Amino acid sequence: MKGVGTDSKAGNMSPKNLLGTTIGDMLRCATDFRSKVIGIALKDRASILPAGHSANAAYWYDKSVAGVITSSYYMEKLPDWVKKFNREAGMKKGYDPKSGADGVTLTFNMAEAALKNEQLGKGETPDMLCISISSTDAISHKTGTWLSPGKENEEVFLTLDRDMKKFLEALDAQVGKGNYLLFLTADHGGSHNPNTLKEHKLPGGGCDMGAKMRDLNEKLKAEFGLDIK
């Protein structure tokens, strides 16, 4: 397994650890593998896992090349339209867009490019485009769900609303109103930053998982003689 579009380990990814099948896999089976299933996200797992084992492609972002990449699990080289997208995206190497509103826009722009260039929804069998917005997850982990002093959280969600509207308009134009099924879901929510809660005299706290793991390992070592590294 190797990266396509990058030489970094960010490309060494596949769904091999996914134990079950996905709705995308079942769609491919039901149409004798004529349907196209494509996953798009900034994070590798957010693109790969929803698309499933038999996906035609999964694309994610690698900051070391400032562009969208994939792996040899799916293809040997990036399609020309992906290369063009990367050239025109204007991202800087080393910058991670996940924690900002530009990550939302980048994801939806990539999804729209896939929609048009892969001619999704234009064939005789239904296609599936899995889009995961990684920025809402990253900003909630970084600042919590409370409005941060710099309003990064607010900006991300306002951008999500605007960009989703634009993408729905692209679906209407490309596939046609009433000709596609759209569903929204999430793997988890966010929570308020415990330090912010304390500032406002609200109950809350954090959990030092590193300390808990060290304590657990010490107890296992004492009880069973296990030296866990």
Residue spans for each PLM region:
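Short glycine/proline-rich turn/loop motifs
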Residues: 3-7, 93-96, 139-146
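Active-site His/acidic residue clusters
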Residues: 48-57, 122-160, 198
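Long, well-ordered early-domain segments
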Residues: 1-91
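Active-site regions of oxyanion-processing enzymes, predominantly non-cytosolic
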Residues: 29-30, 34-41, 47-50, 104-138
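Phosphate/oxyanion-binding active-site loops and adjacent basic polyanion-contact surfaces
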Residues: 15-20, 96-112, 122, 149, ...
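Generic, well-ordered alpha-helical scaffold segments in large soluble proteins
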Residues: 26, 30, 110-118, 132, ...
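Secreted, luminal/periplasmic, and some membrane-associated catalytic domains
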Residues: 1-12, 53, 77-79, 85-87, ...
